[in-house]
Swiss-Prot record:
The keyword Nucleus does not apply. The keyword Ribosomal protein does not apply. PROSITE patterns: S_R_A_B_BARREL (PS51502). Pfam families: Dabb. It comes from Arabidopsis thaliana (Mouse-ear cress). This is Stress-response A/B barrel domain-containing protein UP3. Involved in stress response. PANTHER family: PTHR33178, STRESS-RESPONSE A_B BARREL DOMAIN-CONTAINING PROTEIN UP3. The lineage of its organism: Eukaryota, Viridiplantae, Streptophyta, Embryophyta, Tracheophyta. Homodimer. A motif (Peroxisomal targeting signal) lies at residues 261-263. It is found in: Peroxisome.
Length: 263
């Protein structure tokens, strides 16, 4: 029998501890921490906050409950703080990870992200629809340059999410080099509609991954066309390879039911 216990913490408004057996406990922190000061958390208007959550549903999870989880998370788009939210199954996984679903949402500021996290409706969805059917969750948050026009990728567009865990003692200059290389990908690969990258500011929930990026393509064929340029792709990877310990790369399709608002 699985039990979920919610314990408010100073550094995290909602920490979930799921007991899978008598001897195994998995700490799943889905919600962003609220230890943001007004001065340090205010985000310039030229930037947005990216929020990614990866879920691993249980092997025996009922398909109707999985669909309910997706729909209930996407329904949170009505909250004032949410600029865009999309939850969907993973289309393809290019690394050794067992995650099955992803949520991507965007906010104007860290304060808005924290307010979304603490909202009773969000708490209810996590408690009732997410925790009972998931046995692993991780999340990353980063500040990114604002995307021109609407913040919402079109339904049917394809996203490639990349998370990097860096080697120990990587200098700040190297981190800037990594983010610079990733930002420049849109110039080298015209098939990329939009791309953002940044350093994760919620390390407690990220399993050691400290740099995240998300690139959107018009459709699967556009993404595959970029992937087919192996020599150019590998040349970009070589620029940062020496700094990287491990990666998670997943792809997903934006569902037609994803919700958003324009800036």
């Amino acid at each position: 029998m699985i039990c979920a216990r919610i314990r408010p913490l100073i550094s995290s408004p909602l920490a979930f501890t799921i007991s899978t057996t008598k001897h195994s406990r998995i700490n799943l922190r889905l919600l962003p921490r609220r230890s943001f000061s007004v001065m340090s958390s205010s985000t310039p208007q030229s930037q947005i906050i990216e929020h990614i959550v990866l879920f691993k549903t249980k092997d025996d999870a009922d398909s109707t409950k999985i669909t309910s989880m997706i729909n209930n998370l996407n329904a949170l788009a009505y909250l004032d703080q949410v600029l865009h939210i999309s939850t969907s199954p993973l289309h393809r996984i290019s690394s050794a990870t067992a995650f099955t679903h992803v949520l991507h949402s965007r906010y104007e500021s860290k304060e808005d992200l924290a307010s979304y996290a603490a909202h009773p409706d969000h708490v209810r969805v996590v408690k009732e629809s997410v925790l009972p059917i998931c046995d692993d969750i991780m999340a990353v948050d980063w500040i990114a340059d604002r995307i021109p026009g609407t913040v919402a990728p079109l339904p049917g567009s394809v996203a490639k999410l990349t998370l990097l865990k860096l080697k120990e003692d990587v200098a700040d200059e190297a981190k800037s080099e990594i983010t610079g290389v990733i930002k420049g990908l849109s110039e080298k690969f015209p098939g990329i509609d939009q791309i953002t990258v940044g350093e994760n500011f919620s390390p407690a929930r990220a399993k050691g991954f400290s740099i995240a990026s998300i690139a959107y393509f018009k459709d699967l064929s556009e993404m595959e066309a970029v992937d087919a340029q192996k020599e150019l792709v590998n040349s970009q990877k070589d620029k940062v390879r020496d700094y990287v310990d491990s990666t998670i790369v997943v792809e997903f399709v934006v569902p037609s039911s994803s919700q958003s608002s324009s800036l």
